C-alpha cells in the first residue's frame, strides 16, 4: 500500500554519513508550538473527512549521556541527521518538528496504521546503519520510535493521539530502545489501560506559545 506522494530516498550505498547532511535541514524543523498546532489542524481535518492520520514520535537513544561524553555540538549534529533521514523517507506534505526532551514528532496526513509502521521502520532501519562524525570519530546511533494512527472517527480528542504516541515511545525505550512500537502493541501487552503512565507535562507549552503560531516561521538549528 503506497501513500500518495511518497518521496523515495536518495540513491547511494554504504553507511550513511549524517555529518554531511546539509545544515539547512535542521532549521526546517517546526518548533514544538508549531508542530502541535499543525497536528491539531490535521487531526481536525482527519476527523471531519474520515481520513487517516499517522503519528510518529522518535527519540535518539541515550542522547543526554552521549552529549555529556562528546559535547553539546552533538545535539546539533543529531538534529541534522534526524531531519535528513526523515526528509528522505517521507513526503513533502508530512510534517516534522521538535518536542520536549530532544524528541521529534512526525505527522503523516492520509496515512493509516499499517503505512505509519512502514514509514517508521524505514526511518529506524536507516539509523541502524548510520554513523555521525564527532571530532573525527565515528559514532553509531539508534532510535526508539513510538507510533499510532487515527484511522477513523473513533479517536475523539487530539490529546489522545499524542498520549498514544508517547505511551508507545515509552514502551520502546523501556524495552531497551532501538525499536519501533505501536500503541496497539502496548494495549496488547498491558491491557486496556494503554500501558505505562503518562506525565501531564510531556507536551506542556509555555503560556506565550499557547496562541496559534505562524507555521511559516521555522525555528533555527
Q: Which residues make up each language-model segment?
A:
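Conserved long alpha-helical elements within nucleotide-processing catalytic cores of c-di-GMP signaling
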Residues: 24-40, 47-54, 61-87, 97-101, ...
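Flexible loop/N-cap segments at domain edges
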Residues: 76, 91-92, 102-109, 133
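A structural signal for short, well-ordered beta-strand segments
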Residues: 104, 143-147
Amino acid at each position: 500500500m503506497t501513500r500518495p506522494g511518497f518521496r523515495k530516498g536518495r540513491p547511494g550505498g554504504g553507511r550513511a554519513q549524517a555529518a554531511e547532511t546539509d545544515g539547512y535541514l535542521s532549521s526546517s524543523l517546526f518548533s514544538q508550538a508549531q508542530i502541535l498546532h499543525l497536528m491539531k489542524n490535521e487531526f481536525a481535518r482527519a476527523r471531519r473527512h474520515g481520513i487517516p492520520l499517522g503519528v510518529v514520535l522518535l527519540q535518539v537513544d541515550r542522547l543526554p549521556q552521549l552529549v555529556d561524553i562528546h559535547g553539546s555540538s552533538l545535539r546539533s549534529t543529531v538534529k541534522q541527521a534526524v531531519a535528513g533521514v526523515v526528509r528522505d523517507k517521507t513526503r513533502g506534505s508530512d510534517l516534522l518538528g521538535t518536542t520536549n526532551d530532544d524528541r521529534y514528532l512526525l505527522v503523516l496526513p492520509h496515512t493509516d496504521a499499517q503505512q505509519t509502521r512502514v514509514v517508521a521502520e524505514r526511518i529506524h532501519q536507516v539509523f541502524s546503519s548510520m554513523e555521525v562524525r564527532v571530532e573525527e570519530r565515528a559514532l553509531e546511533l539508534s532510535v526508539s520510535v513510538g507510533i499510532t494512527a487515527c484511522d477513523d472517527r473513533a479517536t475523539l480528542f487530539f490529546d489522545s493521539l499524542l498520549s498514544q504516541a508517547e505511551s508507545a515511545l515509552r514502551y520502546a525505550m523501556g524495552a531497551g530502545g532501538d525499536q519501533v512500537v505501536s500503541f496497539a502493541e502496548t494495549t496488547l501487552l498491558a491491557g486496556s489501560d494503554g500501558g505505562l503512565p503518562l506525565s501531564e507535562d510531556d507536551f506542556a507549552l509555555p503560556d506565550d506559545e499557547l496562541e496559534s503560531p505562524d507555521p511559516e516561521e521555522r525555528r533555527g538549528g
